[in-house]
Amino acid sequence: MRSLKGVALVVCLGLFFLWGAVLPGSSTAIPAFDPSKVADMSEYDPGKIVFPTGDTFKIGLMEAFSGPGAANGRYYWLTTSWNAYDYNKRGGIMVDGKRKMIEIIKGDTQSKPAITKKTAERLCLEDKVNVLWGASGSHICLVIQKVAEKYKTIYHNPMSLSPALMDGKNFNRYAFRTCLDTNMFGEAMAYYFARRPEKKFYILNQDYSYGHDMADGFKKGLAKHKPDAVVVGESFHPLFLKDFAPYLTKVQGSGAEVIFSGDWTPDGPTMVKQAVQMGLRLPVANLYIDNRPLMETIGGPTGEIMINANDYMVSVETPQNKAIIDIWHESSKDWSAPYDTDEWIWPVTIFGRSIDATYWMFDVIERAGTTDPEKIIATWEGDEYMGLVGKLKMRACDHQVIRDIFVTQFEFPNKWHEKGASYGKAIRIDSMYCMPPVADDLDRCKK
């Protein structure tokens, strides 16, 4: 078998120290992702991986592994198992005075809050997990967050964006969010469109807290960065919708120049596919609609309607990012089903974002040196880490990450997809232009 250690490192190691772990204007190093420490990933196969059991460091992966949202389970099994395999190949994670192998235990939410509660409780009480990790849907995350607090278990949320998760009503000390929130996304996208001519926007989002928060965040961003913009329509649809025609007909009649949508899989791809079929080829400002099969289905040039904003992109040019992309791409060539198609060959958006966040989490836990949640909390609060595409800072008072956001318009042709549009040059929006606000009712942030 080939060794992947040298694939990315020959070019990148020298550059790592130039990018690396020193903040601008400072000689003080901060912890950083180091590509030279990544294990040989040539034997990694997410379709076949089996984790050790027994005296392990246990992560409860909370995600939909069945039901209409099951694609998300496949996504995040891939990413968490990547991180765990890497660390296990290095000898495990150093905690409590010894190295422990990492075990990923699936917790199927079925995208249902009641099932989520039972599953999270089982993971805490029976499996004795050290960390709960997930999940798609802020309404699902809220349930996990409450269980984590009850059983004093660290909860890592690398994917769900509702600001309400970290407000005075719902915040708890055990929960940490390592991804952008809806306000950060809305501000970054509005900042980007302030430099484009379009002024008429139609908001089309999923009908639950996250979708409404996405709409509010974007409208606040427009008011701040593009005050002459007009929201010509606003619709919210049920999760896992099959027929978007009634909503897209409203968009057609609204005079909109851009569709703004925070929809995640399967709704986002379904919506865009049906919009194209109806002849509605407006720019789609989005977060999660970068699906490779969708881009191939709608055709290369058509995919250039996609404008994506996110906190990770494969097209961000840093030594760390280049290294992990090359290692991932080489490893993917030998993966088995369901990961044996070209959908998985690059660590796009949610893949790169979540492995970046989990490398940070492991780094924090090793620096804490223990599985004691109180010491992990103390280490993570206020922590700074140089990740794959830039600095991550955990705001101490509300456990919300502060980070730059990236925006790109999809291009065809491109490096990432031979048959469809994909990521173009990433425009970095500095965190000062998309700073997550602190909830007014979170008293601990007023001290």
Language-model-detected regions and their locations in the chain:
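Bacterial N-terminal signal peptides
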Residues: 10-21
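Solvent-exposed, acidic/polar segments of extracytosolic/periplasmic ligand-binding ectodomains
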Residues: 29-53, 57, 384-447
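Extracytoplasmic "Venus flytrap"
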Residues: 38-83, 107-113, 136-139, 204-212, ...
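Beta-alpha junction/loop-to-helix N-cap segments that form part of ligand/metal-binding clefts
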Residues: 40-47, 71-78, 90-166, 178, ...
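Extracytoplasmic ligand/sensor domains, especially the bilobed periplasmic-binding protein
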Residues: 44-45, 114, 129-234, 283-315
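Periplasmic-binding protein-like
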Residues: 123-136, 156-158, 202-205, 255-265, ...
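Extracellular/periplasmic periplasmic-binding protein-like sensory domains
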Residues: 272-355, 366-369, 414, 420-446
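Short, charged, surface-exposed loops that flank catalytic or proteolytic processing sites
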Residues: 366-378
